[in-house]
C-alpha cells in the first residue's frame, strides 16, 4: 500500500546494496589466501578495533597496525591497503535503479552507512556516487553507527525531511527495523528484484503509468 504522504527521499545503505561489502569476513578470508596471515588472530583483532575505525576514532593506518602489522610481515602496508580498497565493486543494477528513480521523481538520495573514512572516500570517488547522492551520512563522519538512533536522526535533520517522507533501504533487517520505529518506511534489501518491487509499492516505479 502506498503511503498517504508522498515519498520525497531515499535513504540507502552502500555495502551489499549499491556496492559490494568493503571488509567483512569474506574479504578477510580472501586476504588470507593472498597474504597468508593467521585468520583467527586477524578476525579477533578486527572485531576489537573495527568499530572504532568505522566511528572515525582511528585511521586505517592505525587499524592495520593493531590488526595486521603488530608483528613483522613479508608484505607491505601499502599492498594490504590496496587489496582492501580493491574489494569494493559496484552492484550495477542497483546503481542504475537509484539513479533512474532520482531522475524520474526528483528524490533526495541520502547515503546512510557504516564505513571507515578511507573506504568511503575511495568508494565515493571510484564509483561516482556524488553524481546522484545528495549527502553522505557515514559513521566515520558523524561518529555514530547504525543501529544507534543518533545516525538516523542526524540523517533526517541534515536532509531536512520528516520520517514519513523517507524510504530506507538496507541489507540488515535490524537497521531497517530501527528506521521503521522512527517513522520511516523500510525495505530489507535481499535482491534487486524484491527491492524494485517494494519501491513500487511506495509509488516509486519505473514502469510507464
Which ranges hold each PLM region?
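Alpha-helical elements of Rossmann-like donor-binding domains used by nucleotide-donor carbohydrate transfer enzymes
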Residues: 26-30, 48, 62, 66, ...
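Active-site neighborhood of HAD-like aspartate-dependent phosphohydrolases
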Residues: 2-45, 182
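Short, surface-exposed acidic
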Residues: 35-45, 72-82, 204-209
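Short, acidic loop-to-helix structural element flanking the phosphoryl-transfer center
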Residues: 6, 69, 78-110, 121, ...
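Asp-based, Mg2+/Mn2+-dependent phosphohydrolase catalytic module
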Residues: 1-12, 116-117, 121-209
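Generic structural signal for small/hydrophobic residues in well-ordered secondary structure
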Residues: 13-16, 56, 101, 111, ...
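A metal-dependent, Asp-based hydrolase signature
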Residues: 51-81
Amino acid at each position: 500500500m502506498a503511503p498517504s504522504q508522498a515519498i520525497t527521499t531515499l535513504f540507502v545503505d552502500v555495502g551489499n546494496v549499491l556496492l559490494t561489502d568493503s571488509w567483512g569476513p569474506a574479504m578477510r578470508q580472501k586476504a588470507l589466501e593472498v597474504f597468508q596471515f593467521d585468520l583467527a588472530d586477524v578476525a579477533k583483532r578486527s572485531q576489537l578495533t573495527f568499530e572504532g575505525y568505522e566511528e572515525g576514532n582511528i585511521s586505517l593506518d592505525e587499524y592495520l597496525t593493531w590488526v595486521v602489522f603488530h608483528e613483522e610481515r613479508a608484505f607491505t602496508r601499502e599492498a594490504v591497503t590496496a587489496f582492501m580498497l580493491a574489494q569494493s565493486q559496484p552492484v550495477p543494477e542497483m546503481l542504475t535503479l537509484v539513479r533512474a528513480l532520482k531522475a524520474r521523481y526528483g528524490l533526495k538520495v541520502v547515503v546512510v552507512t557504516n564505513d571507515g573514512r578511507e573506504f568511503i572516500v575511495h568508494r565515493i570517488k571510484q564509483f561516482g556516487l556524488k553524481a546522484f547522492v545528495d549527502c553522505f551520512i557515514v559513521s566515520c563522519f558523524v561518529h555514530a553507527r547504525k543501529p544507534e538512533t543518533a545516525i538516523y536522526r542526524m540523517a533526517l535533520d541534515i536532509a531536512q525531511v520528516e520520517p514519513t517522507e523517507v524510504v530506507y533501504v538496507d541489507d540488515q533487517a535490524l537497521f531497517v527495523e530501527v528506521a521503521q520505529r522512527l517513522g520511516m518506511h523500510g525495505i530489507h534489501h535481499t535482491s534487486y528484484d524484491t527491492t524494485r518491487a517494494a519501491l513500487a509499492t511506495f509509488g516509486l516505479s519505473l514502469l510507464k503509468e
